[in-house]
Amino acid sequence: MEYNFREIEKKWQQKWFSQNKYKVTEDSPKPKYYVLEMFPYPSGKLHMGHVRNYSIGDVFARFMRLKGYNVLHPMGWDAFGLPAENAAIKHGIHPSDWTWSNIENMKRQLKELGISYDWDREVATCHPDYYKWTQWMFLQFYKAGLAYRKRSYVNWCPSCETVLANEQVVNGRCERCKSLVGKKDLEQWFFRITKYAERLLRDIDKLDGWPEKVKIMQKNWIGRSEGAEIEFEIDGLGKRIKVFTTRPDTLFGVTYLVLAPEHPLTKEIIAGKPQEKECLEFIEKMQYLNEIERTSTETEKEGRFTGGYAIHPLTGKKVPIYIANYVLVDYGTGAVMGVPAHDQRDFEFAKKYNLPIKVVIKGDGVDIQNLQSAYEGEGVLINSGEFNGLKNTEAMKKITEYLEKNGYGKACVTYKLRDWLISRQRYWGAPIPIVYCDDCGIVPVPEEELPVLLPYNVEFKPTGQSPLAYCEEFVNTTCPKCGKPARRETDTMDTFICSSWYYFRYTDPKNSEKPFEKSLVDYWLPVDQYIGGVEHAILHLLYSRFFTKVLYDLGYISFEEPFKNLLTQGMVLKDGAKMSKSLGNIVSPEEIVEKYGADTARLFILFAAPPERDLEWSDQGVEGCFRFLNRLWRLYIELKDKLSDSSLPGQSELDDELNYRLNYTIKKVTEDIGERFNFNTAISSIMELLNFLYDYKEKGSLNRELILKTLKNFLILIYPFTPHIACELWEIMGFEGDIEDVSWPEYDESALVRKNVEIAVQINGKVRARFDVPVDISEEELKQKIMNNEKIKTLLEGKEIVKFIYVKNRLVNIVIK
């Protein structure tokens, strides 16, 4: 009877999914457990990263069910986004048709992997029943003052004639057509995430179940800085430039100011000056560089003098105003003070443009007459008027107080985090539920009129505006306030909005009256185990935390953090690089499943590396896992016939060892899955137990009761990893009930106390023999046993024993000469 994985896997998948085996409700007496993998963009085909992500989640789900939990394990589709629109442009396929076809194919692939989802809870963000509530979320944010519109510089692709999100710009070029990306000033919608910056930062420390590296990444992204906001009067303009600094103690060392080229005051300052033309050319040039390029330490600092001057608030002296590549308009105030003596970036800029360098902090052993680089350390203030002689840490406070008293500044906390730009000039996204009326201005669509549906008949040729702008039946509407003709907002929402609340919708996916019932969300959430790639460590996870806090504040939920525990899995590599079409190193999951089966694919992907590490693909590794499952199959088929003989001998000399190994493996697998996420070592211990079972079968007479107990528990242990073969062998062996309804085995602590132990005997460091001896044997008894052994006697003949070293219960080393 061969291991026919195709037949076995098809049989069990049919049974599971036709019977809704993994459907759950909230009325179970069991404790709840919500395990969730980040839902995929429906590109049409699963890749190995998906297989890894969903296999990890399925181990948790199947394990926790057997541990007695009511497990919610749903799946859905992050279905809006640019690729669908690009497919429409390239192939003439409507984004909706393309997306739903892809969903159908990927759903089939997931079922063929045997992932235990409750498919009754499936959601797709592009379905009107879902995006109706995405639009509802927007309206709640708008009512709470968290959604607003303003002009903003955005990424602009001149070839595609469209705005691009930051993530669609790679090395300064359009991800799709590779054109250089510039900047364009447009009216855009934003979410006021900065209002939540302090809470988002503070509550990171509550996330005990998150990897430290992810918490650090979020802290750095939020980027809290304490300092002062200082105002410099612009000479002759009657306006002020605000700068933020963490070093107000260096204020007397300011010898110039730098504005971002896009700063709203730049054009006013240069207007009519000889430098105007040169500055305008520089501003144009900056539009073709992205933020990473402009702020990189490897990028040469470049600037232009504006011809304007600012008045120093403490000295009254004029300081020149420059524009430069390294200052960004939407970071801080878009302006910085140049203190070349005490900031290395400013030092390099001052040297390049021959600007004065004024030392105002004297550190121990610093030659202030001959600075070779900026001195950024602590010290005592000099050249700082009435503040001379103060320690710089004390001067920070004193100077800030002086500025505040005289109306030139104040103590301030700022964040690197910027408000979330949510407008997208694309078709395939959730329409922003806003109407523009000449009389009433900006008017939100009433909730009862949601969803604002995406029209099907649209033209996808890129023009620089959303395709919706050219769809008259969509654009032309009536004002909900006054009933006069009005125009709909034609931008759609960033797809990150759809994925910032989907985990709530899974709790109540068919509710047509509200996004979710509060009692259901409060029952299931927070998510107990969230699993996804570390590339989502910042944006998706931060936005989800933001959404959760807003919904908590608005009274829709009773908790402030969405994900209790987070596991970020590593990438799947081949030949040391991430799998990609361009490198030609993609391995198709479908081909692996077809050739070896889903259980083999799952086993390899879980065995080859710990979940959080990158995994190197290995054809030999896959073959090895396939051989292991074949060995497992053969053992059970052979033993089934032998165990039908009820007159088997009752005892074997290996019984104690088998019982020990069984209990050890139960303990190891339980802890590796439930506490350490070390699936690879759990599988390794299962493989070792199989090897011993073969030894037991060959060497000992079978203890029927013990071997049946071992075989039964073995299948439960391997079930979360390879469920199809486990279910099939359980049925073949005639074990009682359904393996999916049994309890996870408990280990017997007393069985883990070994009666015998194997001692390796070395002579001059080389293992020459092994002895099976009682655990409590004395050193003298052991020495006698070894010295009486014929093989050892021969090896020691004519030699002098210098030392007899015994490491209890492990080894003996006899040193001879």
Curated annotation (Swiss-Prot):
Family note: Belongs to the class-I aminoacyl-tRNA synthetase family.
EC annotation from Swiss-Prot or TrEMBL: 6.1.1.4
Keyword field contains Isomerase: no
Residues involved in ATP binding: K581
The UniProt record lists the keyword Transport: no
Name of the featured protein: Leucine--tRNA ligase
PROSITE patterns in the record: AA_TRNA_LIGASE_I
InterPro entries, per database record: aa-tRNA-synth_I_CS, aa-tRNA-synth_Ia, Leu-tRNA-ligase, Leu_tRNA-synth_edit, M/V/L/I-tRNA-synth_anticd-bd, Methionyl/Leucyl_tRNA_Synth, Rossmann-like_a/b/a_fold, tRNAsynth_Ia_anticodon-bd
Top-level lineage group: Bacteria
UniProt GO MF annotations: aminoacyl-tRNA deacylase activity; ATP binding; leucine-tRNA ligase activity
